[in-house]
Amino acid sequence: MDQKKLLKNIGIGLGAIVLFLLLSYGYVPQVLDGKIVNQSDISGYMGMSHEMNEWNAAHPDDPTYWTDSMFGGMPTTAISTQNGGDYTQSIYNLLLTGKRPATYLFIALLGAFLLMLALGISWPLALGGAVAVAFCSYNFQIIQVGHNTKMQAIAFFPWVLAALVYTYRSTKGKGRWLAKTLLGAVLFGVALSMQVKANHQQITYYLAILVLLYALVELIDVLTKNKDRIGRFFVASALLLVVGCVGIATNVNKLLPLAKYTPHTMRGGSELTQDGDVKGGGLDLDYATAWSYGWEELPNLMIPNFNGGASAQAVDPAKSETIKLLKRAGQSNTREIAKSLPMYWGPQPFTAGPMYMGAITVFLFILGLFCYKGKEKWWLVVGTVIAVLMAVGNHFMAFTKFCFNVLPLYNKFRTVSMALVVLQVTLPMLGFLALDRIVKDWVEPKDFLKKSGIAFALTGGLCLLFFLIPTLAGDFTAASDAGQQDVLVEAFQQDRIALLRQDALVSFILIAVAWGLLLWALLPKDAPRYRKLIAGVAICALVTVNLFTTGKRYLNADHFTTPKDFGKPFAERPVDQMIKADPDPSYRVLDLSVNVFNSSIPSYHHKSVGGYSPAKLQRYQDLIEHYLTGEINAVYGSMQEAKTIDEVEAGLPATPVLNALNTRYIVVGGDYAPVYNKAALGNAWFVDEAVRAASPDEEIAFLGSVDLRHQAVIGKDMPDVTFAPADSTDTIVLASYAPNELRYHYKAAGNRLAVFSEIYYPDGWKAQVDGTPADVLRSDWTLRSMALPAGEHDIVMRFEPDSYRVGAGISRASSITLILLLLLSLGGMFLPARKK
């Protein structure tokens, strides 16, 4: 590359970076004032991670991989990924430098720009294509609710594809093709390392499907059209495979603990039987497909409010029939109500918004089906179709069951509608490939008129049809309308129709203008060449304005708050202060002032019985379903007639499982004293008898029939233990508490079986009695137990999972290898030039 061209490319790159910074920070200027997005999921993270973060900050040389803050205790595997050993983590952190979420948008824009360039798209159009990828509405929705890891994984998605495409295209060159191919493969490994580092395996899974499809398309191409490049294809594929594995291996410090943890979680399935069948490994199919995209929702890919938009949708209070009705009924604060009306009427339980890809993007994609002849079309079309079939989930159960039962790991994922993130890259890629070829005069004007007319009819025509006859979309009623007054439901319907018609008209106009610009540029035949560039740039501008303004529906100034206000839910209440006055180092709290199993706010202050996590331990989930929910409801019931805390305490029902979890305090409100549960069994106790269960079903059933204070239920997979009944002189106490280490002191007149009110987990908890290793057993379905010798002894339990140590070692070696490969491949690009 000559110096002039190099300087030009550097200028284009720097210009793109400046533009993307302006777009990213211009979209969320609030971050420049120190504000943050009021994200519900991040609020939940703050609660569940508080104990871990506090400990790790105070003990950096002894980090904890366990927390007792949620669900009685669980590994931090699904909470934190800050594990040592990965030297490429510094690169990741550097890329994320800046104010979030602006930095997420910037990374997505830059990666998509590189992808468009790798596909051979001219840089002015590549800028527009980058916006079409990064500013899809779904990205703003997940940022607003706090799915940050998902957004990071999506942001690095196009980086991986860009390196993949560059690698295979490098095999076509005549000079230095091997050096370029090696560089591409190494960049692929680095990009994949970053994408996996985001720690959202489901997005990575969809990315893997696209990667495999592209490799397959390349293989078919060399076998059918370019047999002289078969050798180069296999060289490139081998390099991609090897270096890609190295890139993934840099994350083994996270992946190995996760692999150990997943089989024990809800994603690993339950050991219990249901209707005579043992549940297989993986999520329940109904649970996994609860959020399935309906076939009837697909038009909202180009008409955002086709199905009402969001479950809590903002409407114009001056035009809304619902708001007018409420005003006539004397309702106050209608302006606030107008910000959150139940407009969504699709088949999903609820949604933050549609998967709007952009009306012009969809038009260009359809146009690409007819106008673009390159092999990439089939890659993108097949990828799009597979993603749609996955996303519709329970609306095409035959395909879903096939994927669930056949595809490796697929049954570990939920919210199948997420597969539509694939369309965020496939639709803009094919659409802007087509636009690029049109601008470059690769399309015959006469042929274009016919094909573009068909594309316009299929997209703009459909939008116009729904504007004129909106009832073609359905009856505009939602499941959430049930129980509402007919007059209110009718108002909802009118608003939903208005939302559809408004967006259908806007989408029609956008598509019509884009089509008109292309016709103006190509017809007549002697039209000046500059028209095509003007048309292309104008279309890019339209895409930007449309996605920018539509995205503001889901992420705008109203969603930002100050860090101080964001932390208010975690402010210490009077009841928290009262509980913390207890000198005992460990006990559990049941907070009835929140949704017990869907809130981690209590975990910020206490060791909670509840919490929120879609990856909680399956045995604890079984305990919730079989016992805890019933016992909590019984507590609620006993409180109905009580007028004082003392009356609540006196009237507490029998709650044997809560007692075994050492649930000492029950919170009924932030300003009230806590209810003291005198029946809590404490941190540890000796039992008189072991009750052996013949099956998991029998094991959990015994919890409802035995006396957990004096009997321990032992599963069939646990070894036999010999011990004598407890004596009145026996004692066992918790001497010190840390999330990753528990110390007990006990005295026993004979050999004993001790049960601890701590959650059992097989991979990592190691125990010693006076320095001698001892086995940690499982009792009472979820609790730890130990067979202890007679006498006076000290017990130390430490959580030291081998997976973290081994994973860190592999990550260390892999990250060093990847960094060296990157340096060598970059050097290899310059060596031939220097020799000349």
Regions found by a protein language model. Give the residues of each.
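Membrane-interface coil-to-helix junctions
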Residues: 20-109, 115, 131-143, 147-155, ...
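Extracytoplasmic/lumenal acceptor-recognition loop(s) of multi-pass membrane glycoenzymes
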Residues: 51, 56, 60-82, 294, ...
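Transmembrane-helix signature of polytopic, membrane-embedded enzymes
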Residues: 116-135, 175-183
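Contiguous transmembrane helix-bundle modules in multi-pass membrane proteins
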Residues: 145-156, 167-171, 178-193, 201-244, ...
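Transmembrane-helix motifs of polytopic, lipid-linked glycan transferases
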Residues: 103-120, 361-364, 430
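Polar, glycine-rich mid-to-C-terminal structural blocks
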Residues: 203, 233-293, 305
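Transmembrane signal-anchor helices characteristic of membrane glycosylation enzymes that use polyprenol
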Residues: 12-48, 242-256, 386-389, 464, ...
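Active-site-proximal, structured, solvent-exposed surfaces of multi-pass membrane proteins
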Residues: 363, 706-836
